[in-house]
């Protein structure tokens, strides 16, 4: 009899537990092997005895998925892998046009040959995108608030306050497949595998995570002051920011390096990396 390995994230709070219980109800006829990814030995050890007809279920948000694809990288998993959303964000689910009611959803085709990012001497796979600029700043501030005991973090509020008062834009050099571009007063410069990141921002509406060329897209918000940038910024949630040609640019390629002129926080699928001046994102193919 096949088994179902269920991995969930207890740090997703109440939503994580609710997601686990909801999935268990849907899989009530299956033999379940449940593990909390915060308190277990790791995927490699846990899945060492997995059989060919066993299934894998990931319960959590984008960060939980990111951890799975990085910790299983190189394991050549051929089993069916399913995703069941819990926590906040869920930009991956939004990008593949799937609702929570339609889950669990099989995700094997979405987690094969994922792109890499190199930052501060380390290399990671990423699922949705690399946030750099005020979006990384928002994650940095949000992490501090969580450490101080805050539960519901309003990242939109953090972004607005950052645009108005706290965040300082940077100079930026972006190199796309060997071609160099320079920008001044850059507010953010994410590089995307999908369209969505940051809890619903459609940064690159033309990006397709399954495109046959395996290209990535970088988007820059640049060149304007605080008030004009703040007025245009909400349009990113519908992907309409790209109509602001004088302050938004998109570059597409397979090998993209972004350099800022001062250290700035970066986020990889919602996971924060501090003090970054440069990152390189590139296709696995």
Q: Language-model segments: which ranges?
A:
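ATP/NTP phosphate-donor binding region
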Residues: 1-59, 64-66, 70-77, 98-101
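Catalytic core of DAGKc-family lipid kinases
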Residues: 5-8, 35, 74-187
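Short glycine-/acidic-enriched loop or helix-start segments at secondary-structure transitions
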Residues: 16-17, 67-70, 92-94, 137, ...
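Short, solvent-exposed amphipathic alpha-helical segments in soluble enzyme
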Residues: 21-24, 73-74, 143-144, 205-208, ...
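Short hydrophobic-aromatic micro-motifs
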Residues: 123-131, 137, 182-193, 197-198, ...
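Gly/Ser/Thr-rich active-site loops/lids in small-molecule metabolic enzymes
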Residues: 146-157, 194-227
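Mixed-charge interfacial surface used for oligomerization/domain docking
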Residues: 168, 175-195, 199-210
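ATP/nucleoside-binding phosphotransfer catalytic cores, i.e., glycine-rich phosphate-binding loops
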Residues: 178, 210-213, 220-285
